[in-house]
Amino acid sequence: MNNTKIPWTEKTWNPMHGCTKWSEGCAHCYAETMAKRLQGMGVKGYENGFAVTLNPDALDEPKKIKKPTMFFVCSMGDLFHTKVPTEYIDKVMETIEACPQHTFQILTKRDLRMHDYFVCHRNGNVPKNVWLGVSIENRLQVVRTTPLKAIRNATVRFLSCEPLLGKLHYGHDIELDGIDWVICGGESGNQARPMQKEWVLHLKDLCDKKGIPFFFKQWGTWGEDGVKRNAKANGCTIDGQIYQAWPKIQ
């Protein structure tokens, strides 16, 4: 459990780590790079690098913090990967339910398994302190929103459009009804792919029209002006303005 520089959360909690590539957005996975670095450093728990690994010793970590905290769950993996047993996900949920003072953000690319877990396995029971999200990097992955929207009892349903690799338009604009929050950001790293300003403005405009909070995280390695430079130097402003809105909790 660690503090993080990710601006849309407060701490990361990794009761598991590791993943396998699933779609285009996975090509330059930051978590894979970090896991292999930790493996090379001999860090305990990362002996297998980025292979899917359960971390049962981490299950109770949130219980040690009394102050209400926002946790990004499995920042170094995907909780709904097929190699994570359902029984283990149950244990993660037990910890979440035992910590009602905290908020837990769960983000996945395995939208169908997440849907089946909450709708079928848990009979629609989603802990009130859980926010559920799916990653969408281009128009081909817009389909991931459908299973997410079908999880009716989620307090917050959100999209992480990072890295945004194309305009979210496939014959028609992405349908955002039923979505409570949208995060957007560009890719970082030496092999980062550019994010066009047009794509960002299109997504922001759709959010504005629906009254959905829009959180622009960063331009990444390629700036608003299309120039490649350090991601920090490229910043997180659009036309000089910061747009980092949060969902409204009923």
Region locations from a protein language model:
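Homeobox/homeodomain signature
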Residues: 3, 9, 44, 49, ...
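General N-terminal targeting signals
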Residues: 30, 46, 88-90, 149, ...
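Residue-level marker of positions within ordered structural domains that often coincide
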Residues: 24, 31-34, 78, 137, ...
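N-terminal [4Fe-4S]-dependent radical SAM core
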Residues: 1-71, 248
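Conserved AdoMet/S-adenosylmethionine-binding subsite of the radical SAM
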Residues: 54-215
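Auxiliary Fe-S-binding modules of radical SAM enzymes
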Residues: 1-17, 21, 38-41, 149, ...
